[in-house]
A protein has these predicted regions:
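Short hydrophobic alpha-helices and adjacent helix-cap/hinge residues
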Residues: 1-236
Length: 236
């Protein structure tokens, strides 16, 4: 049995074997990326768990506007090589959501670590904000991204609390540790004889909103009480 914690890893494993059971998690679009035939009936040797649906980018935009209502232009950072659908999975709903509220939307792709700093610096203008896509590459380089956003005083929202633990402003997304537990349960079912082809791909059931009040203060932002009341955790 093989476990894949990201879209690139799942893609590699699916290409390498059609017989060994594969359980993936932290994957965005398993149908679009060709890992399974459908969510309800994977039909192959792989199954697992979606981390977030594409529409989540609209939610990130809404939350960023709540904490930083002055923002008029928002960029979304991702690596096309590791993001689901090369980034299009989240980009399409992000662009639509931005248009609906009259904001300028910008794609901010990065291909290497060395590109992160200039891409973030390019967004460091008054009334700009940043969304970091749910993607293995930004997660792996979260310290650099968070540090640069703070340096440029750029309001940013992230997909996982790990970014906020590192000093990021706020995050909203599924709980990674819950995905690990659910993947372990699927592994147990497969070891007991069930087939991956018949185990449906499941969506997240737990989401969390985490806000770093210290970072908000450093950015000169006042977090609305309505947002504080909805937070699962406040970091002070």
């Amino acid at each position: 049995m093989l476990l894949a914690q990201s879209t690139p890893t799942a893609a590699t494993l699916v290409q390498q074997t059609s017989t060994i059971p594969i359980i993936f998690f932290s994957v965005g679009d398993p149908v679009g990326d060709g890992f399974v035939a459908s969510l309800s009936r994977p039909g192959r040797n792989a199954t697992g768990f979606i981390n977030m649906e594409g529409s989540m980018s609209g939610k990130w935009l809404d939350l960023l506007r709540e904490v930083a209502p002055h923002v008029r232009s928002v960029a979304i950072l991702f690596n096309p090589a590791t993001a689901p659908g090369g980034g299009s999975y989240y980009l399409k709903p992000f662009n639509a959501a931005a248009r609906s509220v009259g904001l300028q939307a910008t794609a901010a792709p990065v291909h290497t670590v060395s590109e992160i700093a200039p891409v973030i610096a390019a967004q460091a203008r008054p009334n700009n904000g940043l969304i970091v896509m749910s993607d293995a590459f930004p997660l792996a380089h979260r310290m650099e991204i968070v540090t640069l956003a703070a340096h440029h005083r750029l309001p940013a929202i992230y997909p996982y609390r790990e970014f906020v633990d590192a000093g990021g402003l706020l995050s909203y997304g599924n709980v990674l540790r819950d995905s690990y537990r659910r993947a372990a349960a699927y592994a147990n079912r497969i070891l007991r004889g069930e087939k991956p082809s018949e185990l449906p791909v499941e969506v997240p059931v737990k989401f969390e909103l985490v806000i770093n009040l210290k970072t908000a203060k450093a950015l000169g932002l006042t977090v609305p009480s309505t947002l504080i009341d909805r937070a699962d955790e406040l970091i002070e």
